[in-house]
């Protein structure tokens, strides 16, 4: 009986102890899980939207914010924006802030159209682009550099795509010669979305007839060709997209000559007329010079000139009275 009581007492002591140990282990595991899933220290990161759209001629804002592991950094920093590709693309904007300053002095602004809107001290590198053009349609990458006690830098890898839209504009329209004395017309336009081109003219009727060239467009440029112009007159190229339309015209007037024999006779007649005209001019000049020679007085002979000289000499020296002779 005493042995049974002793065994029951041992079991009563062991069970609470085991329960306490298990509870302590579970608590420790919960504490470890809380540390793992808690927010880690700040790391480098860049937040940019995938795309920004704006119309040509307007302005666009490229947002860019970042985080970094260096808390309360107030040393010198540089903000940079690149175009085309990260790390190696050409810089379009750069500014630098001195230690403790929130003013980022602009060192580079391509064509004066890029301006920093954000404050790098507050982890904001947002950029404003003025007077957009179709050439600005590309990808841009923001970058920040620390150069104080901490030397560190970070740049966005994917960047933000700037999508520029534009109404169509015809940049060239011309008529070019083709083999076999034929002519063809070319029309080149730009726009985004790429415009659809159509030709209208005497040979195409009154309605617009779309004649798209098999040549592919280059970038935002699209070219349409009218391969054979069979009639003289006005040919109009029309470019249109969702933002508008544009038109330009070119005129074709061909010289319609006669047959071969008539053409030769016409050329010979023109040459003969020019020859007669030249002979008439030469004859008129010769007739004008002839009266001038007849009206010119003859030159007096030399003998008369000498006699008059002697006469003048005798008049200037009259004869003196004869000298008186004295006899011895």
From Swiss-Prot:
Function, as annotated, reads:
Binds sialylated glycoproteins.
All ranges on the Cytoplasmic side of the membrane: 285-328
Q: Where is this chain glycosylated?
A: 172
The protein's matches in SMART domains, at most eight in alphabetical order, are given as: IG (SM00409)
Please indicate the ranges of residues that lie on the Extracellular side.
Answer: 20-263
Protein name in UniProt: Sialic acid-binding Ig-like lectin 15
Q: What span is annotated as the signal peptide, if there is one?
A: 1-19
Chain intervals with Polar residues compositional bias: 301-318
Family the entry assigns: Belongs to the immunoglobulin superfamily. SIGLEC (sialic acid binding Ig-like lectin) family.
Where's the Ig-like C2-type domain? Answer: 168-251
UniProt cross-references to SUPFAM superfamilies, sorted A to Z: Immunoglobulin
- Regions crossing the membrane: 264-284
What GO biological process term is on the record, naming one? regulation of bone resorption
User: Coiled coil located at which positions?
Assistant: none
Q: Does the keyword Transit peptide apply?
A: no
Naturally occurring in which organism (per UniProt): Homo sapiens (Human)
């Amino acid at each position: 009986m005493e042995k049974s009581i002793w065994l029951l007492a041992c079991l009563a002591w062991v069970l609470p102890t085991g329960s306490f140990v298990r509870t302590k282990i579970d608590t420790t595991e919960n504490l470890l899980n809380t540390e793992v899933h808690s927010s880690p220290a700040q790391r480098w990161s860049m937040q940019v939207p995938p795309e920004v759209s704006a119309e040509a001629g307007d302005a666009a804002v490229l947002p860019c914010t970042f985080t970094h592991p260096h808390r309360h950094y107030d040393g010198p920093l540089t903000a940079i924006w690149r175009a085309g590709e990260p790390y190696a693309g050409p810089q379009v904007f750069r500014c630098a802030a001195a230690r403790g300053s929130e003013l980022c002095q602009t060192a580079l602004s391509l064509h004066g159209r890029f301006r920093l809107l954000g404050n790098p001290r507050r982890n904001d590198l947002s950029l404003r682009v003025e007077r957009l053009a179709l050439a600005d349609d590309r990808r841009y990458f923001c970058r920040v550099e620390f150069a104080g006690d901490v030397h560190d830098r970070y740049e966005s890898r994917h960047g933000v795509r700037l999508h520029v839209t534009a109404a169509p504009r015809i940049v060239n329209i011309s008529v070019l010669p083709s083999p076999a004395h034929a002519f063809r017309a070319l029309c080149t336009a730009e726009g985004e979305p790429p415009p659809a081109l159509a030709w209208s003219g005497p040979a195409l009727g009154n309605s617009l007839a779309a004649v798209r060239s098999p040549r592919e467009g280059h970038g935002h440029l699209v070219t349409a060709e009218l391969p054979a112009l069979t009639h003289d007159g006005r040919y109009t190229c029309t470019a249109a997209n969702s933002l508008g339309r544009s038109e330009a015209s070119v005129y074709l007037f061909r010289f319609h000559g006669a047959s071969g024999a008539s053409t030769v006779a016409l050329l010979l007649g023109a040459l003969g007329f020019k020859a007669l005209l030249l002979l008439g001019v030469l004859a008129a000049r010769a007739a004008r010079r002839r009266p001038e020679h007849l009206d010119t007085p003859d030159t007096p002979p030399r003998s008369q000139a000498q006699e008059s000289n002697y006469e003048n000499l005798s008049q200037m020296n009259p004869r003196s009275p004869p000298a008186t002779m004295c006899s011895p």
